[in-house]
């Protein structure tokens, strides 16, 4: 059985010189969590399997991803590094990979131009391309008969709508259908973030995580809502995810990566120690 991956996420803004890791609730009310390079070093030493580095304001502001911060981060870590935020061209991907990233995450640009996934996958390989999908629950079933309807924890039927620009713009696109299309176009992984759960510490959005894990053949990275090790366990055991991404519980030293992995190992979830 393949080991499950634990992936700290560094959400970075350019609000101060050199970049700053931030965390908020549903991508708003952001508070500083530290220097991205120092946090990356700590996670590398603590046993993280990979790192995800997201310039969360790049797409919204049309700004190029922070190449200098990527270079400094890549110099300090020796585990796979995925970089996302404002990536909308082949040249940008090339720059980021040259700066030291192992994979790139595409989100808004892929929704706007799905062929960008195929083009980038053809050039750099599917293993290099992660499609990030931000989604929100939508309980308007009556007016959306073509959507994939799932049953929420309380029995309410809902479909999941893709949102872009850091959650600021709804698209009307069904998240399950979009994930399948991204796989067909050549994406090597899906990074799934529930905007309803992001930063809430209420646990992963299990219905959509489980649905994508069951429907797709490529790995699903669960994201949004981790507040304790039990939530990560549920992401694997109930959500069937291949990897668990978390931010708050690691950034603010509530739990170490080693503690989380020990918790999972004791519950027979295969992890790399």
UniProtKB/Swiss-Prot annotation:
<dbReference type="InterPro" id="IPR011060">
    <property type="entry name" value="RibuloseP-bd_barrel"/>
</dbReference>
<protein>
    <recommendedName>
        <fullName>Imidazole glycerol phosphate synthase subunit HisF</fullName>
        <ecNumber>4.3.2.10</ecNumber>
    </recommendedName>
</protein>
<comment type="pathway">
    <text>Amino-acid biosynthesis; L-histidine biosynthesis; L-histidine from 5-phospho-alpha-D-ribose 1-diphosphate: step 5/9.</text>
</comment>
<dbReference type="InterPro" id="IPR006062">
    <property type="entry name" value="His_biosynth"/>
</dbReference>
<keyword id="KW-0028">Amino-acid biosynthesis</keyword>
<dbReference type="GO" id="GO:0000105">
    <property type="term" value="P:L-histidine biosynthetic process"/>
</dbReference>
<keyword id="KW-0368">Histidine biosynthesis</keyword>
<dbReference type="InterPro" id="IPR004651">
    <property type="entry name" value="HisF"/>
</dbReference>
<dbReference type="InterPro" id="IPR013785">
    <property type="entry name" value="Aldolase_TIM"/>
</dbReference>
<comment type="function">
    <text>IGPS catalyzes the conversion of PRFAR and glutamine to IGP, AICAR and glutamate. The HisF subunit catalyzes the cyclization activity that produces IGP and AICAR from PRFAR using the ammonia provided by the HisH subunit.</text>
</comment>
<dbReference type="GO" id="GO:0000107">
    <property type="term" value="F:imidazoleglycerol-phosphate synthase activity"/>
</dbReference>
<keyword id="KW-0456">Lyase</keyword>
<feature type="active site">
    <location>
        <position position="11"/>
    </location>
</feature>
<comment type="similarity">
    <text>Belongs to the HisA/HisF family.</text>
</comment>
<dbReference type="GO" id="GO:0016829">
    <property type="term" value="F:lyase activity"/>
</dbReference>
<dbReference type="GO" id="GO:0005737">
    <property type="term" value="C:cytoplasm"/>
</dbReference>
<comment type="subunit">
    <text>Heterodimer of HisH and HisF.</text>
</comment>
<dbReference type="Pfam" id="PF00977">
    <property type="entry name" value="His_biosynth"/>
</dbReference>
<keyword id="KW-0963">Cytoplasm</keyword>
<dbReference type="InterPro" id="IPR050064">
    <property type="entry name" value="IGPS_HisA/HisF"/>
</dbReference>
<feature type="active site">
    <location>
        <position position="134"/>
    </location>
</feature>
């Amino acid at each position: 059985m393949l080991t499950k991956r634990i992936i700290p996420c560094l959400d970075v803004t350019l609000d101060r010189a050199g970049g700053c890791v931030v965390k908020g609730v549903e991508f708003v009310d952001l508070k500083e969590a530290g220097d991205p390079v120092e946090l990356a070093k700590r996670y590398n030493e603590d046993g993280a399997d990979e790192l995800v580095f997201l310039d969360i304001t790049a797409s919204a502001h049309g700004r190029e991803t922070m190449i200098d911060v990527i270079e400094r981060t890549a110099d300090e870590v020796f585990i796979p590094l995925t970089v996302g935020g404002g990536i909308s061209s082949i040249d940008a991907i090339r720059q980021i990979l040259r700066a030291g990233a192992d994979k790139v995450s595409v989100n808004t640009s892929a929704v706007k131009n799905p062929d960008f996934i195929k083009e980038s996958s053809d050039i750099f390989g599917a293993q290099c391309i992660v499609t990030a999908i931000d989604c929100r629950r939508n309980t308007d079933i009556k007016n959306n008969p073509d959507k994939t309807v799932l049953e929420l924890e309380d029995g309410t039927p809902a479909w999941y709508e893709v949102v872009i620009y850091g959650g600021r713009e709804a698209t009307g696109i069904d998240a399950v259908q979009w994930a399948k299309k991204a796989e067909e176009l050549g994406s090597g992984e899906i990074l799934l973030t529930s905007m309803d759960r992001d930063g809430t510490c209420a646990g992963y959005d299990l219905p959509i995580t489980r649905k994508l894990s069951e429907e797709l053949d490529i790995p699903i990275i669960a994201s949004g809502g981790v507040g304790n090790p039990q939530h990560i366990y549920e992401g694997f055991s109930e959500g069937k995810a291949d990897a668990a991404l978390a931010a708050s519980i690691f950034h603010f030293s509530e739990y170490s990566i080693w503690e989380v992995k020990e918790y999972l190992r004791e519950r027979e979830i295969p992890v790399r120690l």
